[in-house]
């Protein structure tokens, strides 16, 4: 906030000793009042660099009252690089600031790869209707044998090492192996046959930890690269054991299930960094491949795979190996050449802070007048109140890289702050594109399982196999031991920066209220309609690279930053169909399905030919009509008697069991037609005579007229079963009668042969996602494992969110300027006291912070205890209320080292004034050099498990089975009553997976999640107009020199 010095312009010529000389003053002029910023002018081209040695700096001008803050101006052009000055003395230890805001949620550990759920088999083709007689409902069939479990595919080649993942949990001890070069992405080999699980071997002893090598110099930061395109998905690897359940993410839009990306290498846990402003979230890069784990003992050479054995018992756990001693710290780096000494600045006197001036109206830019004589420096004005921090300006082009300055004195590491609260769960990753599907192969005959041979070289990429039916869920394995921490991954290339939006007007700051007690959980709200996804903004241009500072030792790793999911990509085109996989193993029996609707009655079978006509018996006397008795079982048909009068239709009896079909007989000879006899009258019914012997069958007489309908007689006795008549040629189909009442369920029939695999059916549409499941009970925590030796320092983490601004304190009295003292050596650090118990956080008070105490020394790390056995995974508990904020944490690690400025003259050190209250948080300073690595802190408490994730999407229907064989033509039976629905029939064989269905409708919006983390700082506002020029500065002094007869003053 100073005036502009225009004294470098050529002055009017003045006579001296017969020649002319021109003044070229280079000192800053006195600081004028800061007017409102004018509109942003266009960036002019940089002028040519002036000549002549640098003049003495002028006296500093008065500090005028601060004007109202205008909008930020346009980014200026980068000036020439100044000479690096001497390193400043290490600053005094600052007051411990308030505890930073809750850390951003760490990315939840990737869950173990869950077995991909197989698609449901498509419904089988409807069998052709049998031409046989409609019989009783058949017995429910047995469940069909599920297909064999698909072979476990050979694992693909290891992918390249991707960008480093977020900081994982602290790993156990183990020697850190060197990072190998990234191998090329290999193609997946053909699927092998699955071997039976072998016996579980005993765990070998943990190897000794090797000595740590010297810390190498830090490499220069590479230029930011553009994110490459997402590569094609790799072949799915074998299903791993079920891992520990990670925290559940917010429910996303139900997409097609993507291939799980490999897991990044967990870096060592660093000390808590100072909470800075949150950076803009970049676009998510492609998921990196899983890095290599550290070497754990030398593995023996792999022998050929033996025949499948039975599952062995769990072996005993081996003894823990001894922790290796930490190696010596590497030698310090070579001291850099000292930079050129900067010009000394003039001693300025600090002015008193004055009140903030009101913002004046922007006046028109006046015409520039001639430069007046240089006035004497005025008395320092009152310093205005500290304004609100301005928005960060646009990044200007990078200047040329200056020479490296002298390395500063290493500061001692501060005390490690308390562990931050566990962050919220990250977003669910977007699914990857689905691979192409191949044509289904014909099912071959199952051969004997041969012995697995040695592993061959990986073949070319095969098509993705079809999804097999879901196998039985395996028993959840115990929690594996934590492996050694791998080396820190390479720093990923930064993604392109987004365009800077307009900054909102800063609102007035409200008074922070007291913390209220958490209220009871409200009722669950109804789901609102799903909102539309916002459009992705265009990517901004990549800024130029800044000059690299001197390489410092690696700093402590900060807390993991937030990984936000980018917008969902458009659904990919469905790939080609994959080749049919080996049929999967037998699945578990499914539950009995709901009863389907009653189908339409089938057509009646062809009517059989009439049997031979028997001789008519004598007519019996008409008795009283008796009540209908229960229908007995139907016996075989007897010989056909003479036709009587048509009786009333009786009620339908229960269906009898269908007997075996008789052999088809030859059609009989056609009888001759008899002569038509005279119509007789009805005679008086005589007494019943004795039954005579049956006479020979006579020829059929002509049909007489229909007689009157008689009353129904009493039920007759069941006669002896007659001989079965031959089956005649089929007659025409009769009229279908109404369906009768349902009969009792029949017995279970014999199991039919397995049908051949049918053609691929159409892909069904994807159903909507189900509601989220209920949260289970929380299980007991397992015993903590042993702490390992300090790991190597990881890359610097992202800056945390800014803390809450404190109330401005009262201004202290102005101190008298003292005489400049020599730079003192830093005093020794005190011993750190034991950490106190964590108490509840109180309300923010208006008190003044006390003076900072001395930093204690770090204690020696305790010896590691043996790791405890893993407990059984318990039921997941309900998520608790958010706890109260913890106490104020210790100051974080020093920020990055900034560019060294020219060293000024040593000012007089004033008497320390009273400590004021913490003012508003200023803009982030440049990063200082990292101090030496501190002793590793204690392992943090594990956080609560997140809520249970959403259920997976329903798989596709399976393939339709082949139509069944047509039934044989049986005799026509009477339509029986419709029986109740039998139990669910056997599942048909699973065919190859169908093509991908269309994307389902997005599910309903889930309940509101927990309040997210603090938002990032908004983009900077538009540049403001430049202010008016200040008065000219005092002459900087100089000397005369001649050039071609003219004198110049430098």
Curated annotation (Swiss-Prot):
Residues glycosylated per entry: 114
GO biological process, one term: extracellular matrix organization
InterPro entries (alphabetical): Collagen, Collagen_superfamily
Basic and acidic residues bias (residue ranges): 78-92, 670-679, 936-947
PTM summary: Prolines at the third position of the tripeptide repeating unit (G-X-Y) are hydroxylated in some or all of the chains.
Low complexity: bias regions: 33-46, 56-77, 161-190, 236-257, 298-311, 320-338, 355-371, 406-425, 452-467, 530-547, 598-642, 649-669, 687-697, 718-727, 781-808, 816-841, 881-903, 911-926
Annotated localization: Secreted; Secreted, Extracellular space; Secreted, Extracellular space, Extracellular matrix
Positions of the UniProt region annotated as Disordered: 1-1050
GO CC term (a single one): extracellular space
Key words, A-Z: Extinct organism protein, Extracellular matrix, Glycoprotein, Hydroxylation, Secreted
Tissue: Expressed in bones.
Residues carrying 5-hydroxylysine: 114
Modified residues (4-hydroxyproline): 10, 13, 40, 46, 377, 380
UniProt biased composition (Gly residues): 20-32, 474-483, 707-716, 764-773
Pfam families on file: Collagen
Family to which the UniProt record says this protein belongs: Belongs to the fibrillar collagen family.
Additional free-text comment from the UniProt record: These protein fragments were extracted from an ancient rib bone collected at Bariloche in Argentina and estimated to be around 19050 years old.
Subunit structure: Trimers of one alpha 2(I) and two alpha 1(I) chains. Interacts (via C-terminus) with TMEM131 (via PapD-L domain); the interaction is direct and is involved in assembly and TRAPPIII ER-to-Golgi transport complex-dependent secretion of collagen.
Annotated function: Type I collagen is a member of group I collagen (fibrillar forming collagen).
Name recorded for this polypeptide: Collagen alpha-2(I) chain
Species for this entry: Megatherium americanum (Giant ground sloth)
């Amino acid at each position: 906030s100073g005036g502009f010095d225009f004294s470098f312009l050529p002055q009017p010529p003045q006579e001296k000793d017969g020649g002319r000389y021109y003044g070229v003053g280079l000192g800053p002029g006195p600081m004028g009042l800061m007017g409102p910023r004018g509109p942003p002018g266009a960036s002019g081209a940089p002028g040519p660099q002036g000549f002549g040695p640098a003049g003495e700096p002028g006296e500093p001008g008065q500090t005028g009252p601060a004007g109202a803050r205008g909008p930020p101006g346009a980014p200026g052009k980068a000036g020439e690089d100044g000479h690096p000055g001497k390193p400043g003395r290490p600053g005094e230890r600052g007051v411990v600031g308030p505890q930073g805001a809750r850390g951003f949620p760490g990315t939840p550990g990737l869950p173990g790869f869950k077995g991909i759920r197989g698609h449901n088999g498509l419904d089988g083709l409807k069998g052709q209707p049998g031409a046989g007689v409609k019989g009783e409902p058949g017995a429910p069939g047995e469940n069909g044998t599920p297909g064999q479990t698909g072979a476990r595919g050979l694992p693909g080649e290891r992918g390249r090492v991707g960008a480093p993942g977020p900081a994982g949990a602290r790993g156990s001890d183990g020697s850190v192996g060197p990072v190998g070069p990234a191998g090329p992405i290999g193609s997946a080999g053909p699927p092998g046959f699955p071997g039976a699980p072998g016996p579980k071997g005993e765990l070998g002893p943990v190897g000794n930890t090797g000595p740590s090598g010297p810390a190498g110099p830090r490499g220069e930061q590479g230029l930011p690269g553009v994110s490459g395109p997402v590569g094609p998905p790799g072949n799915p690897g074998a299903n791993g054991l079920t891992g520990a359940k990670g925290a559940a993410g917010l429910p996303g839009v139900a997409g097609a299930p993507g291939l799980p990306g490999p897991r990044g290498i967990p870096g060592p846990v660093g000390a808590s960094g100072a909470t800075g402003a949150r950076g803009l979230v970049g676009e998510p890069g492609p998921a990196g491949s899983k890095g290599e784990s550290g070497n754990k003992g030398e593995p023996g050479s792999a022998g050929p795979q033996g025949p499948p054995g039975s599952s062995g018992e769990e072996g005993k756990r081996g003894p823990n190996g001894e922790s290796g001693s930490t190696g010596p710290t590497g030698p310090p780096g070579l001291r850099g050449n000292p930079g050129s000494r900067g010009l000394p600045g003039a001693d300025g006197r600090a002015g008193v802070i004055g009140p903030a001036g009101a913002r004046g109206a922007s006046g028109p830019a006046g015409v520039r007048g001639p430069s007046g004589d240089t006035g004497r420096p005025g008395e320092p004005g009152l310093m205005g109140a500290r304004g609100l921090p301005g928005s960060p300006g646009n990044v200007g082009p990078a200047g040329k890289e200056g020479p490296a300055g002298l390395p500063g004195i290493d500061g001692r590491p501060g005390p490690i702050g308390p562990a931050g609260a566990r962050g919220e769960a990250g977003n669910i990753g977007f699914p990857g594109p689905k691979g192409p599907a191949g044509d289904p192969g014909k099912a071959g005959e199952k051969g004997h399982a041969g012995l697995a041979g040695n592993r061959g070289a990986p073949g070319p990429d095969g098509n993705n196999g079809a999804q097999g039916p879901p196998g039985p869920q395996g028993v959840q394995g115990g929690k594996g031991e934590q492996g050694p921490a791998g080396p820190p991954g390479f720093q990923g290339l930064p993604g392109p920066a987004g365009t800077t939006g307009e900054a909102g007007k800063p609102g007035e700051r409200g008074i922070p209220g007291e913390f209220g007690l958490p209220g009871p959980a409200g009722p669950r709200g109804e789901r609102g309609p799903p909102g539309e996804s916002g459009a992705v903004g265009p990517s901004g241009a990549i800024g130029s690279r800044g000059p690299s500072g001197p390489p410092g030792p690696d700093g402590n790793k900060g807390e993991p930053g937030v990984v936000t999911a980018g917008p969902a990509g458009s659904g990919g085109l469905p790939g080609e169909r994959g080749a049919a996989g080996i049929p999967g193993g037998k699945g578990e029996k499914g539950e009995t399905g709901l009863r389907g609707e009653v189908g339409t009655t089938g057509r009646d079978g062809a009517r059989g030919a009439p049997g031979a006509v028997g001789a008519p018996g004598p007519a019996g006397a008409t008795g009283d009509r008796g009540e209908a008795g229960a229908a007995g079982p139907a016996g075989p048909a007897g010989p056909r008697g003479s036709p009587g009068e048509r009786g009333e239709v009786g009620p339908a009896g229960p269906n009898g069991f269908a007997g075996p079909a008789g052999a088809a007989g030859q059609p009989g000879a056609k009888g001759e037609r008899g002569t038509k006899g005279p119509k007789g009258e009805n005679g008086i019914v005589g007494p019943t005579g004795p039954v005579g012997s049956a006479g020979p069958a006579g020829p059929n007489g002509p049909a007489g007229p229909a007689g009157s309908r008689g009353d129904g007689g009493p039920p007759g006795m069941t006669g002896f079963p007659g001989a079965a008549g031959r089956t005649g040629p089929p007659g025409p189909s009769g009229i279908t009668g109404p369906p009768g009442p349902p009969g009792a369920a029949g017995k279970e029939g014999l199991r039919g042969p397995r049908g051949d695999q049918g053609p691929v059916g159409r892909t069904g549409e994807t159903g909507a996602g189900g509601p989220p499941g209920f949260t289970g009970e929380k299980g007991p925590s397992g015993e903590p494992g042993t702490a390992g030796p300090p790991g190597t320092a990881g890359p610097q983490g992202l800056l945390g969110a800014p803390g809450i601004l404190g109330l401005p304190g009262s201004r202290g009295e102005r101190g008298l300027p003292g005489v400049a003292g020599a730079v003192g050596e830093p005093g020794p650090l005190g011993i750190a006291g034991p950490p106190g118990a964590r108490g509840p956080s109180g309300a923010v008070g208006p008190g003044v912070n006390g003076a900072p105490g001395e930093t204690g020394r770090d204690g020696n790390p305790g010896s590691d205890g043996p790791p405890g056995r893993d407990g059984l995974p318990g039921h997941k508990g309900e998520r608790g209320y958010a706890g109260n904020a913890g106490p104020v944490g210790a100051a974080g690690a020093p920020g990055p080292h900034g560019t060294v400025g020219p060293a000024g003259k040593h000012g007089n050190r004033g008497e320390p004034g009273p400590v004021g209250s913490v003012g508003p948080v200023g803009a982030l300073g440049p990063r200082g050099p990292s101090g030496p690595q501190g002793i590793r802190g204690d392992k943090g408490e594990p956080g609560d498990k997140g809520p249970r994730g959403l259920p997976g999407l329903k798989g596709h229907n399976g393939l339709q089975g082949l139509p069944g064989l047509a039934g044989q033509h049986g005799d026509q039976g009477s339509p029986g009553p419709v029986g109740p629905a039998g139990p669910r029939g056997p599942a048909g064989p699973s065919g190859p997976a169908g093509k991908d269905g269309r994307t389902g409708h997005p599910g309903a919006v889930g309940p509101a999640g927990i309040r997210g983390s603090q938002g990032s700082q908004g983009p900077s506002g538009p540049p403001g107009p430049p202010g008016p020029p200040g008065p000219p500065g005092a002459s900087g002094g100089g000397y005369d020199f001649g050039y071609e007869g003219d004198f110049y003053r430098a």
